[in-house]
């Protein structure tokens, strides 16, 4: 029975992933809680604009644990290796990489006794993508549109001024090329949730995914300012650099803390974008993906070995990320 459940996706991968786009008499309910309007969904998932000022980025330090740093590395990497994917897909795929890495680490250090679901064959039949050393099972989001309708595109074409036959042919060739390169949006499949659902009495028939909303929320709250950085601007007792931010004498509101974390995320995303951009000019997408994990390992926060370091936090100097950039020739 379990083997049959593992292979269930072979029988219904296309049908399951296209439910939201199927025509119905009544207004269809959103799949996985997402709005039916793809453009609105993508707008709601937008991350802070990356800070690309090298001086600002190079002087910044963030305080975090390893998992959200993996997530940030992966979601920015996919911006370069899979640029045709919407942000919802990049967040879902990056969360898949992060969760799979955390699961393997937990098993390795002995705090989780169950083997990773992918090693037991769960998700067999779903397409595979290799991202930062991980083989991620994905589900195609058939029919998902997020960049505007063909009617809008056609209206733009009609509104353009008359052009020569040669220019028309050139425009048609460019349009055909864009159509060929357009990717089908993807979800990362949550194999651990799939195993849990299929081995429980009340298992769901849906193929579970990593929700983009959860990945975004994780990123938005994960990057604190080290204590030593806060001390420079606030009247607080001196603490050792690298510890959690101390409580200042003047109360810091939740809104202030959230804005600070968002700013730190902007700085981190900027550092990663500058790193990937420097190498994307000389490496193909596969080679860029292969190097990403090694770059992460070189800058990840130092924590205690084994179970003692699980969830541990430390400082990440963004200048260390910038130092990994390719030197101009």
Where would I find each of the regions flagged by the language model?
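Basic, Lys/Arg-rich alpha-helical nucleic-acid-recognition elements, primarily the DNA-binding modules
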Residues: 1
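Structure-specific DNA junction-binding interface
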Residues: 4-329
């Amino acid at each position: 029975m379990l083997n049959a459940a593992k292979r269930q996706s072979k029988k219904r991968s296309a049908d399951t992933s296209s439910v939201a786009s199927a025509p119905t008499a009544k207004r269809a309910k959103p799949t996985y809680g997402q709005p039916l309007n793809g453009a609105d969904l993508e707008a709601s998932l937008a991350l802070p604009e990356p800070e690309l000022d090298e001086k600002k980025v190079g002087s910044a330090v963030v305080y975090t644990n390893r998992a959200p740093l993996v997530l940030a590395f992966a979601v920015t990497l996919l911006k370069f290796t899979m640029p045709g994917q919407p942000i919802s897909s990049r967040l879902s795929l990056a969360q898949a990489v992060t969760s799979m890495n955390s699961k393997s680490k937990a098993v390795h250090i002995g705090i989780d006794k169950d083997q990773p679901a992918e090693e037991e064959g769960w998700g067999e039949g779903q397409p595979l993508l290799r991202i930062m050393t991980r083989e991620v099972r994905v589900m195609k989001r058939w029919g998902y549109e997020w960049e505007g309708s063909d009617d809008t595109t056609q209206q733009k074409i009609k509104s353009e001024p008359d052009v020569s036959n040669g220019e028309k042919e050139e425009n048609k060739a460019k349009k055909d090329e864009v159509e060929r390169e357009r990717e089908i949006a993807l979800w990362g499949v949550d194999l651990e949730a799939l195993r849990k659902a299929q081995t429980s009495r009340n298992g769901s028939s849906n193929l579970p995914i990593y929700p983009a909303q959860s990945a975004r929320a994780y990123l938005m709250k994960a990057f604190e300012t080290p204590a030593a950085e806060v001390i420079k601007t606030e009247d607080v007792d001196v603490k050792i650099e690298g510890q959690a931010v101390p409580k200042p004498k003047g109360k810091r509101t939740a809104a202030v803390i959230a804005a600070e974390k968002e700013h730190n995320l902007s700085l981190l995303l900027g550092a990663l974008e500058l790193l990937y951009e420097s190498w994307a000019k000389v490496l193909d997408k596969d080679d860029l993906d292969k190097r990403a994990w090694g770059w992460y390992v070189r800058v990840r926060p130092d924590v205690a070995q084994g179970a003692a370091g699980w969830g541990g936090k430390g400082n990440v100097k963004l200048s260390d990320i910038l130092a990994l950039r390719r030197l101009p020739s």
